[in-house]
Amino acid sequence: MSFEVGTRCWYPHKELGWIGAEVIKNEFNDGKYHLELQLEDDEIVSVDTKDLNNDKDQSLPLLRNPPILEATEDLTSLSYLNEPAVLHAIKQRYSQLNIYTYSGIVLIATNPFDRVDQLYTQDMIQAYAGKRRGELEPHLFAIAEEAYRLMKNDKQNQTIVVSGESGAGKTVSAKYIMRYFASVEEENSATVQHQVEMSETEQKILATNPIMEAFGNAKTTRNDNSSRFGKYLEILFDKDTSIIGARIRTYLLERSRLVYQPPIERNYHIFYQLMAGLPAQTKEELHLTDASDYFYMNQGGDTKINGIDDAKEYKITVDALTLVGITKETQHQIFKILAALLHIGNIEIKKTRNDASLSADEPNLKLACELLGIDAYNFAKWVTKKQIITRSEKIVSNLNYSQALVAKDSVAKFIYSALFDWLVENINTVLCNPAVNDQISSFIGVLDIYGFEHFEKNSFEQFCINYANEKLQQEFNQHVFKLEQEEYVKEEIEWSFIEFNDNQPCIDLIENKLGILSLLDEESRLPAGSDESWTQKLYQTLDKSPTNKVFSKPRFGQTKFIVSHYALDVAYDVEGFIEKNRDTVSDGHLEVLKASTNETLINILEGLEKAAKKLEEAKKLELEQAGSKKPGPIRTVNRKPTLGSMFKQSLIELMNTINSTNVHYIRCIKPNADKEAWQFDNLMVLSQLRACGVLETIRISCAGFPSRWTFEEFVLRYYILIPHEQWDLIFKKKETTEEDIISVVKMILDATVKDKSKYQIGNTKIFFKAGMLAYLEKLRSNKMHNSIVMIQKKIRAKYYRKQYLQISQAIKYLQNNIKGFIIRQRVNDEMKVNCATLLQAAYRGHSIRANVFSVLRTITNLQKKIRKELKQRQLKQEHEYNAAVTIQSKVRTFEPRSRFLRTKKDTVVVQSLIRRRAAQRKLKQLKADAKSVNHLKEVSYKLENKVIELTQNLASKVKENKEMTERIKELQVQVEESAKLQETLENMKKEHLIDIDNQKSKDMELQKTIENNLQSTEQTLKDAQLELEDMVKQHDELKEESKKQLEELEQTKKTLVEYQTLNGDLQNEVKSLKEEIARLQTAMSLGTVTTSVLPQTPLKDVMGGGASNFNNMMLENSDLSPNDLNLKSRSTPSSGNNHIDSLSVDRENGVNATQINEELYRLLEDTEILNQEITEGLLKGFEVPDAGVAIQLSKRDVVYPARILIIVLSEMWRFGLTKQSESFLAQVLTTIQKVVTQLKGNDLIPSGVFWLANVRELYSFVVFALNSILTEETFKNGMTDEEYKEYVSLVTELKDDFEALSYNIYNIWLKKLQKQLQKKAINAVVISESLPGFSAGETSGFLNKIFANTEEYTMDDILTFFNSIYWCMKSFHIENEVFHAVVTTLLNYVDAICFNELIMKRNFLSWKRGLQLNYNVTRLEEWCKTHGLTDGTECLQHLIQTAKLLQVRKYTIEDIDILRGICYSLTPAQLQKLISQYQVADYESPIPQEILRYVADIVKKEAALSSSGNDSKGHEHSSSIFITPETGPFTDPFSLIKTRKFDQVEAYIPAWLSLPSTKRIVDLVAQQVVQDGH
């Protein structure tokens, strides 16, 4: 051992067991080593020893492991495997809320005394499903999974042994193991989210837990739910490894608890559950009141358990009993028996001097006997009397008071024990009936048995419990030793025999022929047998060699004996051994019970007799086999088996079962006696580690090679211990073989370990002796320290050299600057002289130039003024000339304009007079015509002619329109020519202006003449105004007369308008019909039929009931010619032939309409052929059109199946084929859902979107149809009210069906998308390293080809997946809201599953992985933004914040507080899990323990706050570390948006579809639509 100064070690401590210490002095004087240790509490301790390497020297401290290993998940990986190291590792993990730790093959489970439901969720079950032990952190489920996989793969039965002292958590652990087996899935579907629903068998198996706990568990000083019996549950599997049943074996029920409970303890839970949960009427029937009123329930004091609702537990127990097949009547009978037991406990026996008496009229006795259905007198008799049967007679004697009490309690214990066994037998009958028994292929047994017990007073129960633990410990030691041997043989290494403590002498002491149990049975069979006489026999027989090594008697007293168990010596008090071992009830009481009228009690007693007969037969068989080996007479004596012998026999059977299976061990530890949450008592845990054999396991491991490393792990960790020339090549090699790695391993070992016995190289691993890893770690630490020092030295040398060079350069630079300054000063002086000379020359030149420029400016100004004066004179002359021209032009135009206005006015007056005379004549004529009766006929005739004339005019107008179009073109040409002419005119205008200027002078002369004429004209104008006033008066008079005549004319017109309106309506109808004929004939030539939205009249003569026609659609079949549709080719009729064509169509209608309807009815009625064609040809034989970035699909290419179905459905409704339509639709709905269910692979996305679009189309049609029925009165025509209601009901039901179909296929499709995405997401988001230069290095590059798995998916695959969804939805016309719902759901799913995977991967929680994760998630965010999903980032918050957590500092409390603010979406439990599992790189400092404890304390406080309901902030608290992914059922996003508009339907049948009947239906519908149009 190395105890250099600074070495960390462990020193014994009275209160803590062990305390950390550090060597502060190591001196060697006088042949002795003197060590001084500084303990963690600052105490200084001195140690003197002669040899520091003497492992057996108890005074030496034990070496401590490096900090990185102190909280290891497997204790066998500790460098120093010693008691304090194991204790400290468990304590460190416990303080970080990790209750599970491996110790080789053993799982150590430390009871948290707190609710940790998050550790046992369905998500956690699925996380461990299919994983090898060691892949994830230690857990109960890892052991269960290992057992399940070994059973499945090796076809070998398994056993899980759960042991520990009372209150350690055995029962809970066993319960969760059972839940795991009932919930785990197959390996190939282990990654799929498990459905919560379990099979009925699995539910029944889990239901056994509350039953067994109610009848077999009780509150003790150490545990509120202590199992007072042992249980071995066999979970049975068939050949397909499916759970088919279970079997339960129980061991040593603590019968004495029924009649006696120590202070603060309780009786079995079932009694308190009855008091709290039974209805008042039932309690009255059973004469029950309160728990405190019954002696069997009130001895312990408080009858309540904090945090437990007995009424709620009662309901759980009753439900479980019902589930396992125990009827309500039988349950009532059981409750009557339990109530009777309580009344028996209250029976008051009267005490006399020598005996006891009990009256048959005692109230409690009467109640008990009434409930049990037995005779009260006989029962009371045998309570106070006993009967001894001799060969010749029966002797009845009285019992004293204490014996009577024992007799009374014995009956109660007998009945309760029999009831417990009967319950177990009934459960086994239900869970393992003959049909199940025939299918059993393998089983997994879960043994929940008491741990080693030692109290101040240890009795028969403790003796049996410790005996069982001795047997289990022996098997455990042998199993561990066997596994060690198998590992060494498998790896082909040299090894020597490992010695371990064998407890066989202790077992022989108990179970040999003259052992404790044998002597106990012998004494129990004697009528006068007593505890004292049995004790003397023990002393005489066993307190001598060789048994005195494990047996001894106490120094004082004769009422105890001491057994040296493997854990420690236990002193047993002999009081009550004989009575408990006998476990008998008097024959008199037995006869009384057998005469009961309670059927359930009779069944219980019969079951007891059957069990006794089986035991006797087994003993007879054993004796016969023994007799065959030893000849001689065989004498059999019928003896009632004792409790000890039965327990021994069942224990032997149990050990045989365990030895025939592969065993797994779970050791439960109780961390403190006060049951305080998360409190750790070192001494208490240490005693349990010794008692449960964990330290013995470690000792066995230490004797061999406890530390094992794979070649890869060893090379990656310790390659730096050899010169880089030896390992440099292996890193650079492209192809690295295993031989290369092993050669590096050998070079490392040769360079570091001189003693070859300290290690062995196996086939796949390197095995090290204890302490070697610490030695290698120290070498590695020293090497890294030296390397760091060397690096620092080089860096510092470079730094100071750089500083020297900078100073030297600065000095040179300063010198250069000074020299430069002096030279510049001298040059400056010279330059100043030169500048002065230059300034003088410049000044003189400037003065001369200024004089010259002044003279030049004066001359220039004089010239400017002269030129200005000349120009102003010229402009004035021009202005006067222009004014004269303007005046001349005005004067010349005045006289001709005045003359024109007078002439125009006169003309208007003359026209008005002439028109008045004409109107008067017309009015007289109209009055005459109005009186004529024949005038109307003539008007009508003229109007008809006018219609014809207008029709001809319309044609001429069309012709004129064409001519006008041509005329426009000609005009456009003319416009262009006009533009050219305009240019010419502009030129001419300029020339004309010149002429005008010449003319101005002439006009000035005429101006004066015009002014004179103007005055005379004004006088003439005044005369004309007077004349105009006279004419206005005459006009007003004519106007009044005209009004009267117009009123008469208006009356005449009204009559005319009525006729015109009637005639116009008729003409419009004729015109619209002609246009319809023309349109239909045109459409027929194109293969298209369009019908109006309004329905047709129902076919009452064909239909069974009234129905409305939904044949309001446009049928288009681009692949069918007019001949295929059986339509005669017609040209579009001209206006002149309209009447003739319409008449011909009318004649054909009567002939063909009936034939078409009959054929349609025949095709639609035969649903078998139609259904087969639609389902197989259309629905199953569908083809999805290609969708992509550049592909634009029309709606008919996408929803053609829906359009075809709508046509067929519409025609069925038209003919009243409601039953056929229901059958047809049922087949359609089932087929579509089945098609979507079978989608997989690359077809999943496009085909799923395709069917979503079609189902939406169908649903929209049905909604449109329903709305039309309810809102339009025309649909009621031809139907009775009942038929109408029936029809509304049919369509409403169909709407619900299509709504359900949309919901179902959306959920099926989305779940399939999630399943497909799950395969890619974890690899792409979590595992792939897309960011170059930041490889996390979980595996080295040069070993990847040998050990690492290649990545299957990258982020490109994820983005391709989402792109495929986007383009398919866009191409198939899916609403944007649906796309948004689908993608956000998938993003949330990716966030959840990736986070759940990441939080369970310890080696992925590093800062480099944080960078990679951040990069991958950022790519998803960018995709969301580019596709309009602004809230996509919110769906990935857990991954985003986890990436941040892995990259930021976590070394101070302030860092943690900041981190909590950043990672607001993560719960405290998730933060604690991530931080505690953070993988520290070699160049990082480990996260301090106080920080880990601080984070754990936050979780504890949050949990306490949540459980107490005092969360003032209202925050939701979740202790689960997993995010529950949303796996359905999902809300159908289509239900949240409006249905599609449905004006017309376009049915498109692709050419590749083979649908002859469907095409014929479309053909006939087309013909009918054409005829209906005519």
Curated annotation (Swiss-Prot):
<feature type="modified residue" description="N-acetylserine">
    <location>
        <position position="2"/>
    </location>
</feature>
<dbReference type="GO" id="GO:0000146">
    <property type="term" value="F:microfilament motor activity"/>
</dbReference>
<dbReference type="GO" id="GO:0045033">
    <property type="term" value="P:peroxisome inheritance"/>
</dbReference>
<feature type="region of interest" description="Actin-binding">
    <location>
        <begin position="443"/>
        <end position="523"/>
    </location>
</feature>
<dbReference type="GO" id="GO:0043332">
    <property type="term" value="C:mating projection tip"/>
</dbReference>
<keyword id="KW-0518">Myosin</keyword>
<dbReference type="GO" id="GO:0015629">
    <property type="term" value="C:actin cytoskeleton"/>
</dbReference>
<dbReference type="InterPro" id="IPR004009">
    <property type="entry name" value="Myosin_N"/>
</dbReference>
<dbReference type="Pfam" id="PF01843">
    <property type="entry name" value="DIL"/>
</dbReference>
<feature type="domain" description="IQ 3">
    <location>
        <begin position="832"/>
        <end position="855"/>
    </location>
</feature>
<protein>
    <recommendedName>
        <fullName>Myosin-2</fullName>
    </recommendedName>
</protein>
<feature type="domain" description="IQ 4">
    <location>
        <begin position="856"/>
        <end position="879"/>
    </location>
</feature>
<dbReference type="GO" id="GO:0005935">
    <property type="term" value="C:cellular bud neck"/>
</dbReference>
<dbReference type="GO" id="GO:0030050">
    <property type="term" value="P:vesicle transport along actin filament"/>
</dbReference>
<dbReference type="GO" id="GO:0031941">
    <property type="term" value="C:filamentous actin"/>
</dbReference>
<feature type="domain" description="Myosin motor">
    <location>
        <begin position="70"/>
        <end position="781"/>
    </location>
</feature>
<dbReference type="InterPro" id="IPR002710">
    <property type="entry name" value="Dilute_dom"/>
</dbReference>
<dbReference type="GO" id="GO:0005737">
    <property type="term" value="C:cytoplasm"/>
</dbReference>
<dbReference type="GO" id="GO:0000132">
    <property type="term" value="P:establishment of mitotic spindle orientation"/>
</dbReference>
<dbReference type="GO" id="GO:0016020">
    <property type="term" value="C:membrane"/>
</dbReference>
<dbReference type="InterPro" id="IPR000048">
    <property type="entry name" value="IQ_motif_EF-hand-BS"/>
</dbReference>
<feature type="modified residue" description="Phosphoserine">
    <location>
        <position position="1121"/>
    </location>
</feature>
<dbReference type="InterPro" id="IPR036103">
    <property type="entry name" value="MYSc_Myo5"/>
</dbReference>
<dbReference type="GO" id="GO:0032432">
    <property type="term" value="C:actin filament bundle"/>
</dbReference>
<feature type="domain" description="Myosin N-terminal SH3-like">
    <location>
        <begin position="4"/>
        <end position="57"/>
    </location>
</feature>
<dbReference type="GO" id="GO:0071563">
    <property type="term" value="C:Myo2p-Vac17p-Vac8p transport complex"/>
</dbReference>
<dbReference type="GO" id="GO:0051015">
    <property type="term" value="F:actin filament binding"/>
</dbReference>
<feature type="region of interest" description="Non alpha-helical, tail domain">
    <location>
        <begin position="1087"/>
        <end position="1574"/>
    </location>
</feature>
<feature type="coiled-coil region">
    <location>
        <begin position="933"/>
        <end position="1088"/>
    </location>
</feature>
<dbReference type="GO" id="GO:0000131">
    <property type="term" value="C:incipient cellular bud site"/>
</dbReference>
<feature type="domain" description="IQ 6">
    <location>
        <begin position="903"/>
        <end position="932"/>
    </location>
</feature>
<dbReference type="InterPro" id="IPR046943">
    <property type="entry name" value="Fungal_Myo2/2A_CBD"/>
</dbReference>
<dbReference type="GO" id="GO:0030133">
    <property type="term" value="C:transport vesicle"/>
</dbReference>
<keyword id="KW-0009">Actin-binding</keyword>
<dbReference type="GO" id="GO:0048313">
    <property type="term" value="P:Golgi inheritance"/>
</dbReference>
<keyword id="KW-0677">Repeat</keyword>
<dbReference type="GO" id="GO:0005524">
    <property type="term" value="F:ATP binding"/>
</dbReference>
<keyword id="KW-0131">Cell cycle</keyword>
<dbReference type="GO" id="GO:0007107">
    <property type="term" value="P:membrane addition at site of cytokinesis"/>
</dbReference>
<dbReference type="GO" id="GO:0034993">
    <property type="term" value="C:meiotic nuclear membrane microtubule tethering complex"/>
</dbReference>
<dbReference type="GO" id="GO:0005516">
    <property type="term" value="F:calmodulin binding"/>
</dbReference>
<dbReference type="GO" id="GO:0031267">
    <property type="term" value="F:small GTPase binding"/>
</dbReference>
